[in-house]
Design a protein with these regions (language model features):
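Active-site microenvironments in enzyme catalytic cores
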Residues: 1-116
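Catalytic-pocket segment enriched in acidic/His residues
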Residues: 67-216
């Protein structure tokens, strides 16, 4: 399958989640494209990486995913992954140093809780030790002589969690509902909390590079 290929094949899955300054942080709404009827959170650790490919820190991330769109065709990955408010990061970037190292990332457990207004609760865990590719190998696949990021990048590392708990009835599986509160946490990286909305109803992304340079 296409998922097995990127899991154990020669090339990792690397894609653009959002443009610089396009992610949302702690407490913000996260967005689902209105066309999606089957979607899910993806609790992940994300690395802060310099333009030279040096990993300097880590944070938590939610790689909001439209499973029905991605499942239709691999060519729709951009539509499944990159929408308004579909990339969440936070609550802070913890820099590597005394008390926190690359080994902590590799051994980390990332917990997920989805709590719906309908009383539904979903819990899960993603263990970094079970991911088939090392953080360093993913960074090398993303940045290097073959592809540059002059201002650095934040790289989501993937997840081992896939929601299977039925929500609407036996065999119907999981999908988000508007108003779900998603909490992603790890002991050394805190907790990232967001509320699910439609991407068309989340605040539009208006602050880009031009506005940043104007403010400077």
């Amino acid at each position: 399958s296409q998922y097995l290929e990127v899991g154990i094949g020669p090339d990792a899955e690397i894609f653009t989640k959002c443009q610089p300054m396009g992610s949302v942080g702690y407490g913000a709404d996260i967005g689902l494209h209105p066309i999606s009827k089957w979607n899910n959170p993806e609790p992940e650790i994300a690395l802060a990486v310099t333009s030279a490919g040096k990993i300097i820190g880590a944070t938590l991330g939610n790689d909001v995913n439209l499973r029905d769109v991605e499942g239709r065709s691999a060519l729709l990955l951009g539509k499944a992954k990159d929408n308004n408010a579909s990339a969440a990061l936070g609550p802070f970037v913890r820099l590597f140093g005394d008390g926190f190292s690359h080994d902590d990332v590799k051994a980390a457990e990332v917990s997920l809780e989805v709590r719906g207004q309908d009383g539904f609760v979903l819990d899960g865990t993603s263990r970094m030790s079970e991911i088939s590719r090392t953080p360093e190998s993913l960074v090398k696949a993303a940045v290097g002589p073959h592809h540059q990021y002059p201002d650095g990048l934040v790289l989501y590392l993937g997840t081992m969690f896939a929601p299977v708990k039925d929500r609407e009835g036996p065999g119907k599986g999981f999908t988000h509902k508007i108003g779900d509160v998603v909490t992603i946490s790890s002991p050394k990286l805190g907790a990232l909390v967001n509320t699910v909305r439609l991407s068309t109803e989340c605040p539009p992304w208006t602050y880009g590079t031009r506005q940043l340079m104007s403010d400077l």
